[in-house]
């Protein structure tokens, strides 16, 4: 089972919150104190809460569930994308489009258009167009890929959202809440934990902290998927009893 230790979190700077003047009182239970005007997050809470969240994500993945990684802040985008791809899951790393979950029918049409344009770009269709028309379609393809590339193969709504920065991604969290999709989110001292099912109190800006969260969630999803494949193989008669 994937777990993260106190040492891992200390080394990554998970405990450093925001300046005290920007705090959200709803995060008070998770704050240890303050140092040099910066809130210090109590890792005695964060360690078990994150490990509980990892166990939940692993369980979702073990049932063929879809995990959607969400992190559109500049610091989080790259790590979110890499982690999601590494565990064969899905991501939104650029901008959360309003209705991405609650208006899935429309999003599905945009994904269909994206796939059409992808096919046209490789089957020679673009070469037969005028220069202007080809350029317009290329731009449309790039725009759609940027917005929807990480969810184009999701094939339906996700089973869990993993979010870096609850404050920044409040629209995504609200949409998930409306649809009853569980949310795991890193919540810093300046944010509200509202609508988050699995709260991970921690720094949501430092690259090392973000990498720790994303790689751990990816490992948990992979481990869960591995359990699913092992069970499937056993059912199919591929695993011999010792």
Curated annotation (Swiss-Prot):
Keyword Transmembrane attached: no
Superkingdom: Bacteria
One GO CC term, this protein: cytosolic small ribosomal subunit
Pfam families: Ribosomal_S2
GO biological process: translation
Entry keywords, A to Z: Ribonucleoprotein, Ribosomal protein
InterPro entries per the UniProt record, alphabetical: Ribosomal_uS2, Ribosomal_uS2_bac/mit/plastid, Ribosomal_uS2_CS, Ribosomal_uS2_flav_dom_sf
Molecular functions per Gene Ontology: structural constituent of ribosome
Family label: Belongs to the universal ribosomal protein uS2 family.
NCBIfam families named among the record's database cross-references: rpsB_bact
Protein name from the UniProt record: Small ribosomal subunit protein uS2
Organism: Shewanella sp. (strain W3-18-1)
Gene that produces this protein: rpsB
């Amino acid at each position: 089972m994937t777990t993260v230790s106190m040492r891992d979190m200390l080394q990554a700077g998970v405990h450093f919150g925001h300046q005290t003047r920007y705090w959200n009182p709803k995060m008070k239970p998770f704050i240890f104190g303050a140092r040099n005007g910066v809130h210090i997050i109590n890792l005695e809470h964060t360690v078990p809460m994150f490990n509980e969240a990892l166990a939940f994500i692993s369980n979702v993945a073990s049932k063929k569930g879809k995990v959607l990684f969400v992190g559109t802040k500049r610091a989080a985008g790259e790590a979110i994308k890499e982690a999601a791809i590494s565990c064969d899951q899905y991501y939104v790393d650029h901008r959360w489009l309003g209705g991405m979950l609650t208006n899935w029918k429309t999003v599905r049409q945009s994904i269909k258009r994206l796939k059409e344009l992808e096919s046209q770009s490789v089957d020679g269709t673009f070469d037969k167009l005028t220069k202007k028309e080809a350029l317009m379609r290329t731009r449309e393809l790039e725009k759609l890929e940027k917005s929807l590339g990480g969810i184009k193969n999701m094939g339906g709504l996700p089973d869990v959202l993993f979010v870096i920065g609850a404050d920044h991604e409040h629209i995504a969290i609200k949409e998930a809440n409306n649809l009853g999709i569980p949310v795991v989110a890193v919540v810093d001292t300046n944010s509200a934990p509202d609508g988050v099912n699995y709260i991970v109190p921690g720094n949501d800006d430092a690259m090392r902290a973000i990498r720790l969260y994303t790689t751990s969630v990816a490992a948990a999803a992979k481990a869960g998927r591995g359990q699913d494949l092992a069970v499937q193989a056993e059912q199919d008669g591929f695993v011999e009893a010792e």
